[in-house]
Amino acid sequence: MASRTKGTTTIEVGADGVAVITLINPPVNSLSFDVLYSLKSNYEEALSRNDVKAIVVTGAKGKFSGGFDISGFGEIQKGTMKEPKVGYISIDILTDLLEAAKKPSVAAIDGLALGGGLELSMACHARISAPGAQLGLPELQLGVIPGFGGTQRLPRLVGLTKALEMILTSKPVKAEEGHSLGLIDAVVPPAELLNAARRWALDIAERRKPWVSSVLKTDKLPPLGEAREILKFAKDQTRRQAPNMKHPLMCLEAVEVGIVSGSRAGLEKEAQVGSEVINLDTTKGLIHVFFSQRGTTKVPGVTDRGLVPRKINKVAIIGGGLMGSGIATALILSNYSVILKEVNEKFLEAGIGRVKANLQSRVKKGKMSKEKFEKTMSLLKGSLDYESFRDVDMVIEAVIENISLKQQIFADLEKYCPQHCILASNTSTIDLNKIGERTKSQDRIIGAHFFSPAHVMPLLEIVRTNHTSAQVIVDLLDVGKKIRKTPVVVGNCTGFAVNRMFFPYTQAAMFLVEHGTDPYLIDKAVSKFGMPMGPFRLCDLVGFGVAIATATQFIENFPERTYKSMIIPLMQEDKRAGEATRKGFYLYDDRRKAKPDPEIKNYIDKARSVSGAKPDPKLEKLSEKEIIEMTFFPVVNEACRVFAEGIAVKAADLDIAGIFGMGFPPYRGGIMFWADSIGSKYIYSKLEEWSKAYGEFFKPCAFLAERGSKGAPLSAPLEQSRSRL
C-alpha cells in the first residue's frame, strides 16, 4: 500500500483583496491529511487578515482535486496513522471553519473535483468551473462513503433523486450538466476561471451575489413523505444489487438522518458511519484492489529500468473472428490505426461487420455519436495479404488454436514486418515459446491475451517468454493502459494466470455433483458469494466445446491433479452444447432465461457409472459455506502454485487477474487476499482433510503446506525471487 502522501496548500493575497488558496499534491491534488491541515491553517490566516475580503480555493496544474488520498485509510487500518477525531474534517474544518466563515469562498474547478474534492467545493459558497470538468462522489466503489459532508450537501444542491444516483453509481457528471443541476454556478473558459472566481467571491462579499451555505439549503429537497419513499426504493435496490456489502446502506442512513433530523445531525451521522466503514472487511478488500490495480504496471526488472514506451501508431490484427474483431474494436476506440487481415473476402467482410456492430451498439446506447462512429470506423482497413504490414508497429495474431498455423504466421510476419514491430499472440492455450520456434525474433514475441468480448472485458494478460525483451513489455503495458485495460504481466505456462488459477473451480464443482451435491445449489451458493454466475451457468454460457477444450489442456498438462468428469461429454452426445442450443445444465427460453432441467440427473447418473463415483452423504448435505470452501480452496491452491512458480511477480497481481478476468468479487479483495482473510492454516487443514478422503485433486501444494503449517500469509513476498519475469 502506498506510503502517506505529502502535500500542501499555498496562499496568495491579491490587490483586489481575494486570497487564493491552491491545493498542491501531484498528480491529482489528492486531499492527504497534510493538505487538509495546511488548508485549515491557510484558511485561518485568510480569515484573520484585514486585507482579505474573500477567498478562492483552486488546484494546481489544471486539476482541482481527485479526492481524499485513500492511502490514509490504509495507514489507519494498519495502525500506522492515528485517525483524526470523528467529524474533525467534515464538521470542524469544512463546516464550522470554511462554510460558516464571515468571509465568502468560491471554488475554481478545473479538470476534476471528485470525492473529497467535490465535497470541499460544495462547502464553498459558490462553484465556478471550466468546461468538461468531472464532478462526482465515487467513494462507494472504494468501500467508503462520502465523508466530508457529501451525503448532506449534494442532495441539497441537486435534489435527492439525482444525488442518490450520483452517490450509488459512483458516476461523475461533467461541468455543463452540473451547471444545469445547480451544482455549478457558472461555466467559464479555463483562461478566465481564476479571474471569474475572484470576481464572484467579491460579488458575494459585497452582497451583489447570494451568499449560499449549501448545507442549509432546503428548496431542492422533496417533502418528508416523498423523501422517505425515494430512500426506501434506493435501499431496496441496494440490498438487491449489493447484498454482501454494508457500506452503501450505511451511506443511505446518513442521507436519511440529514433529511429527517436536519443537516447537522446528518453530518454527525456521516462522520460516525465514515469512521465505522474503514474497518469493514469489504472496505479493506476494495482498498486493496484499488492499490493493487495501480500496481500491476510496476514490474521489477522491467519498469524500473528507465525505459520509455515507443509510440505505437499502426496495429495489425490477424483473424477477424469474435476475438480478433473485439481487439480491433478496442484499438480503434482508442484512436489506433488498425489493419484487419483475413484469408478471404467473405471472412474479411464478416470481421469488419463485427467491428461495425460493436460500434453501432455504442451508438444505440447513446455512448457514441454517428459522426464519431464514422470517424472511428475510418481507422479500420481490411487486408487479404501481408503487404500492408510493412509499416505496422505491432501485430496481434488472433486465429484458431492451431500450433502449426500460428508458427507459419509468425514465420511470415518476420519476413514482412519492420524489425521494431512487436509480434503478439492472443493464444490462451499454446506455449508461446513453441509459437516463435521458427523465427529469429523471439525477443519481440509476447502474449497479448484478451478476454471475450475483448472490447468489453477489462483484463489484458501480458505473457512474457524467457526471451521477450523488457522494451516490448513496457510498450504493451502502455498500449494496455491506452485502450483502457488493466494489464497484468505474467509468465508463460499452461493457461497463464487466470485460466490456470481457475481450472480447479469448474472441476471441483463437477466433483461435488458426481458425489451428491445438487448443481443448482452450487450455482446458487457461488452467485450469493459474489461471482457473476455459478460454474454450471458459466459452462452453458461459454459453450461445451470451449469447456471441453479448456479442460483437456489441463488434463494433459496436470494429470495428477485434475478431476475428469464425463458429465459434459455425455451431454454433448445428446446435442446439448449450452446456451447456444438452449440446452445445457439449464434450459433456456426465447429470452435466454435459464431454468433448472430435471433431466440433468440422468447425465449425472451416467457419469457416475463411468467414473465409479458414488453419492457421499456428507457431500449431499453441504452448507453454502462448505460449497464455497470446496469450490474455491482448490483455486487458492492453484494460485499458490502459480505464485510459487514465479508466473506472477506479486500475489496482488493474481488478485487483480481473478477479479477482472473471472469476475471474482472485488469486495473480497481477490483470491489471495480472500484466502489470507480466512487464514492459510484453516485452508491447508481443509485441503489436507479432503485429500485424504477424496484424493489428489485436493492435495495442498508444497507452498501452501509450508505457509499453512505456520499460519503464514499466502500473499507475503517469496523469500527468494523465483519469478520467471
From Swiss-Prot:
TM regions (residue ranges): none
Pfam family, one: 3HCDH
Highest rank taxon of the organism: Eukaryota
Gene Ontology CC annotation, any one: glyoxysome
Reaction(s) catalysed (UniProt annotation): a (3S)-3-hydroxyacyl-CoA = a (2E)-enoyl-CoA + H2O; a 4-saturated-(3S)-3-hydroxyacyl-CoA = a (3E)-enoyl-CoA + H2O; a (3Z)-enoyl-CoA = a 4-saturated (2E)-enoyl-CoA; a (3E)-enoyl-CoA = a 4-saturated (2E)-enoyl-CoA
Pathway: Lipid metabolism; fatty acid beta-oxidation
GO molecular function: 3-hydroxyacyl-CoA dehydratase activity; 3-hydroxyacyl-CoA dehydrogenase activity; 3-hydroxybutyryl-CoA epimerase activity; delta(3)-delta(2)-enoyl-CoA isomerase activity; enoyl-CoA hydratase activity; NAD+ binding
Sequence motif: Microbody targeting signal, positions: 723-725
Enzyme Commission identifier(s): 4.2.1.17, 5.1.2.3, 5.3.3.8, 1.1.1.35
Cellular compartment(s): Glyoxysome
Active site residues according to the UniProt entry: 119, 139
Keywords recorded for this protein, A-Z: Fatty acid metabolism, Glyoxysome, Isomerase, Lipid metabolism, Lyase, Multifunctional enzyme, NAD, Oxidoreductase, Peroxisome
Methyltransferase as UniProt keyword: no
GO biological process, one term: fatty acid beta-oxidation
InterPro entries: 3-OHacyl-CoA_DH_CS, 3-OHacyl-CoA_DH_NAD-bd, 3HC_DH_C, 6-PGluconate_DH-like_C_sf, ClpP/crotonase-like_dom_sf, Enoyl-CoA_hyd/isom_CS, Enoyl-CoA_hydra/iso, NAD(P)-bd_dom_sf
Domain notes: The epimerase and isomerase activities are contained in the N-terminal region while the dehydrogenase activity is in the C-terminal region.
Family indicated by similarity: In the N-terminal section; belongs to the enoyl-CoA hydratase/isomerase family.
Protein name (Swiss-Prot/TrEMBL): Glyoxysomal fatty acid beta-oxidation multifunctional protein MFP-a
